[in-house]
Amino acid sequence: MPIRDQIIQIVRGHDLTEEQAAEAMEEIMTGVATPAQVAALLTALHLKGETDAEIAGMARVMRAKAIPVHFDGPLLDTCGTGGDSAGTFNISTTAAFIAAGAGATVAKHGNRAMSSVCGSADVLEGLGVTIDLDAAGVARCLEQAGIGFMFAQKFHPAMRFVGPVRREIGIRTIFNALGPLSNPAQARHQTLGVADPALAEKMARALYLLGAQHALVVHGHGGLDELTLSGPNLVIEVRAGHKPRRYEVSAGDLGLTPAPREALLGGDVSTNVAIVRAILSGEERGARRDVALLNAAAALVAADYAADLREGLQQARQSLESGAALARLERLITVSSINR
């Protein structure tokens, strides 16, 4: 079905099947669809409301069009959809180093700031990591440092057909959901934060359709796209071969001290770099450390290193207190700079 017919179908209030969504994405990612058609499709989907099948179908094509990163072994990603406008520091990036220090191999996929001041690419660059590596460079980091970063714009060349349209229409679209589902290293273990609780269910079902091995989709109290300390957090756990399981978790349930969102605020790149370093070095002992530990615990559950969040917290604390998490950062800085 041509994308023109799919636009008409959506405008009439009908959902696309996973296959139809994939067909539309194929036209977009190959430049067959015109900019006007891309804008119309994205806007129509936004107004109708994207389904899990539509998200999965388009993500499947986006994965296929990405430049692949090859690694022999299970991989973990920690990321979020963004859009919470909360101004927190780079929690999932900090959690990635803690999880790596506990033994998980982390293939982090991210970009520069979109809705915030400092994205994962920005803070990693500020920390001294070389962020614009090719696939071979990232694979080397995974093998030698236990963690690697894939700069999204480097690995998704087909996005050149979409980027200008997204900037011009200026609304959140299905592509905000697709980024976290399009890891070029095909990481099948994942924590995925969403700011919109309605999107959490859709993302969990999309991950299931895409064959995730083990993933935790989280929606933080107060509308954050991270687990937070201020109240009950929604978790939807996805395991291969099992229906997604929904539950809530609070900081107090795990022995962590509750704290308001304001205690997790970050700032510009230099501020967030200092915060990440303070946590990984053991200098920071307050709420920022606790929220990084909590999100690292979730990552370790998703990576199948921990049976539950309580065990994950123990492993995360050990990673920090032993210096292993900081060592992963220092090693990534070194390995990513080879042959630069």
UniProtKB/Swiss-Prot annotation:
Q: What is this protein called?
A: Anthranilate phosphoribosyltransferase
Q: What does this protein do?
A: Catalyzes the transfer of the phosphoribosyl group of 5-phosphorylribose-1-pyrophosphate (PRPP) to anthranilate to yield N-(5'-phosphoribosyl)-anthranilate (PRA).
- Cofactor, how bound (note): Binds 2 magnesium ions per monomer.
Which cofactors, if any, are listed as required?
A: Mg(2+)
Main enzyme class: transferase
Which Gene Ontology MF annotations are present?
A: anthranilate phosphoribosyltransferase activity; magnesium ion binding
Q: Could you say which residues bind Mg(2+) 1 here?
A: S92, E226
Source species taxonomy: Bacteria, Bacillati, Chloroflexota, Chloroflexia, Chloroflexales
NCBIfam families found in the cross-reference section: trpD
The entry's anthranilate 1-binding residues are G80, N111
Task: Quote a single Gene Ontology cellular component term.
Answer: cytosol
Keyword tags: Amino-acid biosynthesis, Aromatic amino acid biosynthesis, Glycosyltransferase, Magnesium, Metal-binding, Transferase, Tryptophan biosynthesis
> What gene name is listed for this protein?
trpD
Quaternary structure per UniProt?
Answer: Homodimer.
Residues the entry annotates as binding 5-phospho-alpha-D-ribose 1-diphosphate:
80, 83-84, 88, 90-93, 108-116, 120
Amino acids binding Mg(2+) 2: D225, E226
| Binding, anthranilate 2 | R166
